[in-house]
Each structure stands twice: as structure tokens, then as C-alpha cells.
UniProtKB/Swiss-Prot annotation:
Binding locations of CTP: G8, R11, R91, R137, R140
Superkingdom, natural source: Bacteria
Required co-factors: Mg(2+); Ni(2+)
Domain notes: Comprises two domains: an N-terminal domain containing the nucleotidyltransferase activity and a C-terminal HD domain associated with both phosphodiesterase and phosphatase activities.
Residue sites binding ATP per the record: G8, R11, R91, R137, R140
Organism: Chromobacterium violaceum (strain ATCC 12472 / DSM 30191 / JCM 1249 / CCUG 213 / NBRC 12614 / NCIMB 9131 / NCTC 9757 / MK)
Role this protein plays: Catalyzes the addition and repair of the essential 3'-terminal CCA sequence in tRNAs without using a nucleic acid template. Adds these three nucleotides in the order of C, C, and A to the tRNA nucleotide-73, using CTP and ATP as substrates and producing inorganic pyrophosphate. tRNA 3'-terminal CCA addition is required both for tRNA processing and repair. Also involved in tRNA surveillance by mediating tandem CCA addition to generate a CCACCA at the 3' terminus of unstable tRNAs. While stable tRNAs receive only 3'-terminal CCA, unstable tRNAs are marked with CCACCA and rapidly degraded.
Catalytic function, reaction form: a tRNA precursor + 2 CTP + ATP = a tRNA with a 3' CCA end + 3 diphosphate; a tRNA with a 3' CCA end + 2 CTP + ATP = a tRNA with a 3' CCACCA end + 3 diphosphate
Protein name per Swiss-Prot or TrEMBL: Multifunctional CCA protein
Binding site for Mg(2+): D21, D23
Lineage, opening ranks: Bacteria, Pseudomonadati, Pseudomonadota, Betaproteobacteria, Neisseriales
Gene (UniProt): cca
Keyword Phosphoprotein in annotation: no
Note: A single active site specifically recognizes both ATP and CTP and is responsible for their addition.
Length: 407
């Protein structure tokens, strides 16, 4: 029995990054031998065991063969005769196909160390094409490490897309990988990589459709809608925003892809126009409710937020109510963060002032000070309660607006 650390733990150590999880491969052993040594079986599809003390995963060396479309369509073979090199050959990328022995020596039959030094993502073998999830994983690694994709690997991914492999991806796995990619330091790299190989049009056609759509150069010097959305997304990432804000950044301008050509580069009504494509995207990928709902209110209301300083007090109150800000203040503040990213995700506007965020935060705080219950209790005419509460809220908003002007 020979035991090696493999995959991401070796890769990250060589890159000088923290090692979070360690995966192990066991060469020359059998399930019975693993059980006899106290390992606990957990693998449903192939022999994986938990170490009796560390609870880390140990997998028997194996080979794989594709028998059907999709990432479930595999059969595997494991035996004491399967070599370490054969096990590494089934892995996706050269940088993930390096093994480390107990003495620290490395087995790197596919040049992973050289690709790490060069900053290149390269497939190990043509078997890469057998698992469409690998397209998403590679794009995610591009976002994490800001590595280039080897030309031959990009060509292989294009062939996979052309062969319909991307269409075999199931919604849960697509969202799982997209969510991880959104949380990387440079999430735009994931989407641009997917677009380059053609997978974005298959997985997220609503986002892909934004590329090539022009905007007014005076508002958007970057002009291209797709370029803008990528900048917004990267700004949100650089600010350390949570997943829901990053997803809202990705989806806030989907309606611009539907603007009639004769109207371009203006995008009148794109806020409402994006509701249907966003809903379809979220339905198809089974996007979590918190991400879906924040993206929706950001899409519908972001231009009103940008104009916040111009809005009448009653319009500010309507904005707060339409966003359910009085019951969900934390979500409203997240929307403001997405709107800030929208403003600064423009060429040359990366440090633009955005007082709208502080202004609306102050308006929300002032409005929340109104005791609606006390007003209702003191209102003799029950039918007048809503209007009386709104009047009180509008009054504090007006006062806050005047104080803001004075400051």
C-alpha cells in the first residue's frame, strides 16, 4: 500500500496558498484491506474511505471510462494493479495531477509544475472531454488563479460545447460551480472563459446576450453591456461582497439585451424588461431565493437608486416600500451595495463618489424610527391608519432630505 496526497492540496502548496482540504489516493490496496485497517467506506460510486482518526478522504487508485453523456455517465475500475500515473491520468488539469509522497517527493507525469509556473490551465488528456462539469471547473480556476487557458484546451472545450456536452449539465451542478466562481477574486474571468469556448451561450444565454450591445458612451465609456456587467461583478468581488450581491451585480442589466436595435444605445425601460429573463434564469438553474430576490429588486430599482437625491420624499417612501426595506432592511442595504458596484463598474468611474448609498441608508434609518404601532393605536379612524403612517414617514424623509442638503 502506497499513499499520496493529490490534487488541490499539492497545487495550492506549490502556489504558496493555504491548504484547506487534503485528498489522498491509495495505490496497491483493496477495499478489504482498507476496512481491516479501520477505514470507513463512504463512496457511493467508487471506493472512498474516511481515515479512522483524521476523517480525511482516501480513495483507491482507479481508472474511469465514459459510457454515457453527462457527468454521471462513467464506469470505473479499481484494483491493486492500477498505478499512480494511471490514476493521475483521469484528472482534469495538469495542475491538479500532481501527487506528493510522505517524504515530500512529487510525481508529476503531465507537467503540472511547469504549468503552475507559467500560469496555464491545460487538460491532462482527451478524457477531459468526457465530463462537461470540467468546463465549469476550469473557468472557475481561471477566476481563482487568473491563469490563461492553453490554446489546445480551449479548442477542446469548444468541441465539447459543439457536441452538446454543455447541454447535459444539470441545474444544481451548474449553480454550484457558478456560485463558487462568483465568490472568486476575479469572477469575470469565469464568465469570459465560458464565453470564449461558447459555453456561456448554452448555460447563461441571458448574460451572453449582453455582449456586443452598446450603451451611451457618456454614461458608459466602456460602451459594451457585457463589459460593463463584468466590471460591476469584479467591483463587487473586490469589495468582498457576499454571493447574493455578486449575483445581483451579474443580473442587474439583463433587460438591455432585449432593447430594440432602433432605440440603441439608449435603454429605456430595461429595468422592467429584465424581469422575465432573470426569472427564467433563476428558475432554470434553481437559484436560491435570497440571490433571486435581491437580483430582482436591484434590477427593477437600480436606476431609481441612482437618482435618489432627486426623488421627492413620497417617492423615496414608495421605493422603500417597493423594496420591502422596512421589513428587510439588511437586504435593502445589500441592494445599495450592488448599486454602488453598478456605478463604479464603468471605465474611468472606479472611484466615483456615490452619496446615494449613504443618503438612502439615512432615509431608511429615519423611516424605521417611526412607531407604526403607536400611530395605529392612536388613530380613531382605522381606515385612515395606512395614510397616517405614510404621512409620518414622508415627513421624516422630507426632514432628512433637508438636513442632507444642509450638510
Amino acid at each position: 500500500m502506497e499513499i499520496y496526497i493529490v490534487g488541490g492540496a499539492v497545487r495550492d502548496r506549490l502556489l504558496g496558498l493555504p491548504v484547506k482540504d487534503r485528498d489522498w489516493v491509495v495505490v496497491g490496496s483493496t477495499p478489504d484491506e482498507m476496512l481491516a485497517q479501520g477505514y470507513r467506506p463512504v463512496g457511493k460510486d467508487f471506493p472512498v474511505f474516511l481515515h479512522p482518526e483524521t476523517q480525511e478522504e482516501y480513495a483507491l487508485a482507479r481508472t474511469e471510462r465514459k459510457i454515457a453523456k453527462g457527468y454521471h455517465g462513467f464506469t470505473f475500475h479499481t484494483s491493486p494493479e492500477v498505478t499512480l500515473e494511471e490514476d493521475l491520468a483521469r484528472r482534469d488539469l495538469t495542475i491538479n495531477a500532481i501527487a506528493e509522497a510522505a517524504d515530500g517527493s512529487l510525481t508529476d507525469p503531465y507537467g503540472g509544475q511547469e504549468d503552475l509556473k507559467a500560469g496555464v490551465l491545460r487538460h491532462v488528456s482527451e478524457a477531459f472531454a468526457e465530463d462537461p462539469v470540467r468546463i465549469l471547473r476550469l473557468a472557475r480556476f481561471a477566476a481563482r488563479f487568473d491563469f490563461a487557458v492553453a490554446p489546445e484546451t480551449m479548442a477542446l472545450m469548444r468541441r465539447m460545447v459543439d457536441d452538446g456536452e454543455a447541454d447535459a449539465l444539470v441545474a444544481e451542478r451548474v449553480w454550484q460551480e457558478l456560485a463558487k466562481g462568483l465568490m472568486e477574486d476575479k469572477p469575470s474571468r469565469m464568465f469570459l472563459t465560458l464565453r470564449e469556448c461558447g459555453a456561456l451561450a448554452r448555460i447563461l444565454p441571458e448574460v451572453d446576450a449582453l455582449f456586443g450591445v452598446p450603451q451611451r458612451a457618456d454614461h458608459h465609456p466602456e460602451i459594451d453591456c457585457g463589459d460593463h456587467v463584468m466590471r460591476v461583478l469584479d467591483y463587487a468581488a473586490a469589495a468582498g461582497q457576499p454571493l447574493a450581491v455578486r449575483f445581483a451585480a451579474l443580473g442587474h442589466d439583463l433587460g438591455k439585451a432585449l432593447t430594440p436595435a432602433k432605440v440603441l444605445p439608449r435603454h429605456i425601460g430595461h429595468e422592467e424588461g429584465g424581469i422575465a429573463p432573470l426569472a427564467e434564469l433563476c428558475r432554470r438553474l434553481r437559484v436560491p431565493n435570497d440571490c433571486r430576490d435581491l437580483a430582482h429588486i436591484t434590477m427593477v430599482h437600480h436606476t431609481k437608486v441612482h437618482r435618489a437625491l432627486e426623488l421627492r420624499p413620497d417617492t423615496v417612501l414608495r421605493l422603500l416600500k417597493d423594496c420591502d426595506a422596512l421589513r428587510r432592511p439588511e437586504r435593502f442595504l445589500q441592494m445599495l451595495d450592488a448599486c454602488l458596484a453598478d456605478t463604479r463598474g464603468r471605465l474611468g468611474f472606479e472611484r466615483a463618489p456615490y452619496p446615494q448609498k449613504d443618503y438612502l441608508q439615512a432615509q431608511l434609518a429615519a423611516t424605521l424610527q417611526i412607531d407604526a404601532g403607536a400611530i395605529a393605536a392612536g388613530c380613531a379612524d382605522k381606515a385612515a391608519i395606512p395614510a397616517t403612517i405614510d404621512a409620518a414617514r414622508t415627513a421624516v424623509i422630507a426632514k432628512c432630505k433637508e438636513e442632507w442638503k444642509e450638510d
